[in-house]
Amino acid sequence: MPATQKPMRYGHTEGHTEVCFDDSGSYIVTCGSDGDVRMWEDLDDDDPKSVNVGEKAFSCALKNGKLVTAVSNNTVQVYTFPEGVPDGILTRFTTNANHVVFNGAGNKIAAGSSDFLVKVVDVMDNSQQQTFRGHDAPVLSLSFDPKDIFLASASCDGTVRVWNISDQTCAVSWPVLQKSNDVVNAKSICRLAWQPKAGKLLAVPVEKSVKLYRRETWSNPFDLSDSSISQTLNIVTWSPCGQYLAAGAINGLIVVWNVETKDCMERVKHEKGYAICGLAWHPTCSRICYTDVEGNLGVLENVCDLSGKVSSNKVSSRVEKDYNDLFDGDDTSSAGDFLNDNAVEIPSFSKGIINEDDDNDDIMLAADHDLGDDENSVDVTMLKADLSHKEEGDDDQARSIHNLPLIRPQRPFYDGPMPTPRQKPFQSSSTPLHLSHRFMVWNSVGIIRCYNDDQDSAIDVEFHDTSIHHATHLLNAFNYTMGTLSHEAILLACESADELASKLHCLHFSSWDSSKEWMVDMPQNEDIEAICLGLGWAAAATTALLLRLFTIGGVQKEVFCLPGPVVSMAGHGEQLCIVYHRGTGFDGDQCLGVQLLELGRKKNQVLHGDPLPLTRKSYLTWLGFSAEGTPCYVDSEGCVRMLNRGLGNTWTPVCNIREHCKGKSDHYWVVGIHENPQQLRCIPCKGSRFPPTLPRPAVAILSFKLPYCQTSTEKGQMEEQFWHSVLFHNYLDYLAKNGYDYEESIKNQAVKEQQELLMKMLALSCKLEREFRCVELADLMTQNAVHLAIKYASRSRKLILAQKLSELAAEKAAELAETQSEEEKEEDFREKLNAGYSHTTTEWSRPRVRSQVEDAEDREDTVSEEKPESHNHGQNLFQSANSSDTPALKSGAVFSSSQGWVNPFKVVVSSKEPAVSANSTRSANILDSMNKSSRKSTSLNRMENNEKSPVIKPLTPKPRSKQASAASYFQKRTPQADKTEEVKENPKSSSSDAPAVCLQNSENQRPKTGFQMWLEENRSQILSDNPDISDETDIIKEGMIRFRVLSAEERKAWTNKAKGETASDGAEAKKRKRVVSEICETENQEETVKENLDLSKKQKALNLPANQKLSAFAFKQ
């Protein structure tokens, strides 16, 4: 029957850990790097007795009620067992003692230290000491000869020595080990051991085998090895009978041999692959205890038979029952008789083979009482004879074993995937319960410490910001083990005791009334396992697989079932995150699930029990939210993961804490995560997983790094930076979706940073001739950045790339228009707006503006032909257009206020034609295929009309604010501006236009900057890309953003261009270098229209029909 491996449990903090049994095997004694010696009644002992012996305990030995320890203060101390009372110091060294062992009688101990010395000390009289000198490096391990004649030692100098105790001389030395300068750097601690009783063999672990040296001759008759051993062996130990030898490797493998037959009897692998550093065989039972370098304790049951004989035990009653059930109703069959009659005669190895094979041939052979002469057969009479010989004494043991036929090794036994022990529930940012001084929680609000001494049991609460609440001291009368903290309350919980129910205790310090605490008892047989706080609510998960919700004032709310036992919980605002066991994990992996709920007015479940990703063979160590409300968690391998709401609520690794640790045994204890600024707040723990309460630990800040490939290259770095920025600004979309306030500048800065990175990656791909990759990068850009990419491709002479990018820009524009139309269909407010008294054109009525303008043009012609001119300057000739059926147009759009003449061609020339031609010019024949939607064109027309109205209407100038004055610098030059210059040159112009003319001229005389010229050049492009912009200030802001994206050379060229420009419009027109001939023709037509308009003003004596004919002619142009 193969050995049974029990689930390991936490024993000590990370570091070298040793284990031994007492003389009777009633106690398991362990010591570790936390300086404690613990006495376990068995592996399931939840409350082992603990004795602190120093800062670190390197080794321990137990014999005759004396417990000897080697500790970090360079001493070897003795304690009474099991009381743990100090009984003096046996010896001292100048450095740490690395190993200490008892002799067989228990009256002497041997200790080896890093100062190269080995000492043998009498336990009763420590003045009786012997010192052995000869090693040239720290001593690794020691072992007493059972007859107290020899002492074996291993050292970092690479030698194994055997000393004669009586004269303190070296009998023999073997240079078989790898040299090192210190114990911590040694590849193996080489825990050697003498064979019990006679001490005929000395076992030494060397590389991947165990060398056995014969006593006194010091020869090496044979080595023990196995094909399953792939790493260096660390330690060996003998069974009490001396027949079996167990060895542990640095990769967690435990192997057991039969020394006489050299057969490998057992192969057991550590569940997590940690190095085995402690092995101890039970004095009487077939049990081995072992420890690893992580401080864990494990047990192997049913290892081998310790009688020193080949097993001849009967088949167990359980196996008999199983076979009887199999042949139920056929008790008199030959198979049943065979099992009852011959069970005694079947050896263990034959039994294993029979049980292992399910073929019918084996059953037939067994029924015939004929095992045959195969290679695994054993004659029963010979076996009985050999067993009788073995009972004669220990000296005949080897001879009787050799008389047995040679048995070949059994084939490896595979147990299948091993289930992983379930992780126990825990509170995030808390330290283990067994510590007398521990943190119950450390978060962004404050700290809760728990002190559980023999004299005092109390809880201290400290707030980082004392304006929230002052520090609080509480008596821990109910033995609270769980605690959490928020800006509103302190929440504590305890498990049930003998007669006390499990309690939930809340101190609501933010309450405005005088009652500031409440308490709730759980039902019988229901214990609280995890708690958390949110905004206005508290939650508790219990052993009954229930989650109970409470208001912060103590009102019970919803109660719902959990799909499995809870592991941990966290709350933030209205969000509640629960991690629980979905099932049983295998091969060291945990099987966890996660639920994310929103507990606001509209309750919602975001994650429906999805599997929680963990690193292989790891467990959950921290669960919480970032300060901005994004769920995060950390596993035992140091991987920090964050919920990516932008990718279907998946989990993305954002940091590996282990990369920041300097030492192998160092860790970081996470206390909080921030997305803005991007900080991982944690406490460094030197040589342990948890920080001490005193002195107060300092918080360190780690940076985030996504695990992208080739981050040493420029491409990999920019890719990591881009997705890093995208991931860590997803919370802004979540805040906006849920109606929270946030700074718009943060999002704008993030978008700008992302677009700059995309442009850099596109430029890099362009240089590397990766044009297809350029298009892929452009697909991630915004509409404005795509236009910049098109310009870059054109200047780089990548014409095919520019064409592909143009097609992509057209697709993006079509998608944007489609999205806008869908939004308009879903939220159509036109009927609601038109039902009221206001007929102001809004963004919801934009598609109707074009038809309204066309209707107004038709009415203009009708009015100008039918009605005679009236010289009443206050009369509006478009009054018929403002009927109840048609909404009014923007004031000042199509009439002159100085003479009262109707200007029928203003809408056509100034609104429609320049808008189309300007856009066609800016695209430089690249975006010719893009069609403008009616919404964009009408928005542009409305914007240009708004810009012209201050010039056309003769209003008295008012004092301007600084913002308005600055905005006037960036006004686009329009035909109306040219008109005012003509009025200035003509002294016969009407005096009513003088204020506007003076104001416009004073603004035009100011020196222009490069940005102003660039904005005039690209104004139409900005308006076409952003149809929703209606304010001049917004146009300037958008222009400034685009101007900053330009390279330094381009900005400098615009500045030089502005310095060399003259004030005249003719020179300005020449410097702009218009390319398209259609624009020139349009400008000529505009000049002709202006001359005709001036002519109509001068000839006031002309009759009305002539003016009407002139107006009709100009309209047709």
UniProtKB/Swiss-Prot annotation:
WD repeats lie at residues 11-50, 52-91, 93-131, 134-173, 184-223, 228-267, 271-310. Residues 816-885, 911-1005, 1054-1074 are annotated as: Disordered. The modification Phosphothreonine is found at residue 819. The modification Phosphoserine is found at residues 333, 377, 821, 910, 923, 1030. Residues 873-885, 917-943, 962-974, 988-1004 have a biased composition (Polar residues). There is a cross-link at residues 390, 1116 (Glycyl lysine isopeptide (Lys-Gly) (interchain with G-Cter in SUMO2)). The keyword DNA-binding applies. Residues 861-872, 975-987 have a biased composition (Basic and acidic residues). There is a cross-link at residue 1116 (Glycyl lysine isopeptide (Lys-Gly) (interchain with G-Cter in SUMO1)). The keyword rRNA processing does not apply. The modification N6-acetyllysine is found at residues 664, 953. One of its GO terms (biological process) is pericentric heterochromatin organization. GO terms for cellular component: chromosome, centromeric region; nucleoplasm. InterPro entries: HMG-box_WDHD1, HMG_box_dom, HMG_box_dom_sf, WD40/YVTN_repeat-like_dom_sf, WD40_repeat_CS, WD40_repeat_dom_sf, WD40_rpt, WDHD1/CFT4_beta-prop_2nd. Core replisome component that acts as a replication initiation factor. Binds directly to the CMG complex and functions as a hub to recruit additional proteins to the replication fork. PANTHER family: WD REPEAT AND HMG-BOX DNA BINDING PROTEIN, WD REPEAT AND HMG-BOX DNA-BINDING PROTEIN 1. This is WD repeat and HMG-box DNA-binding protein 1. It comes from Mus musculus. The lineage of its organism: Eukaryota, Metazoa, Chordata, Craniata, Vertebrata.
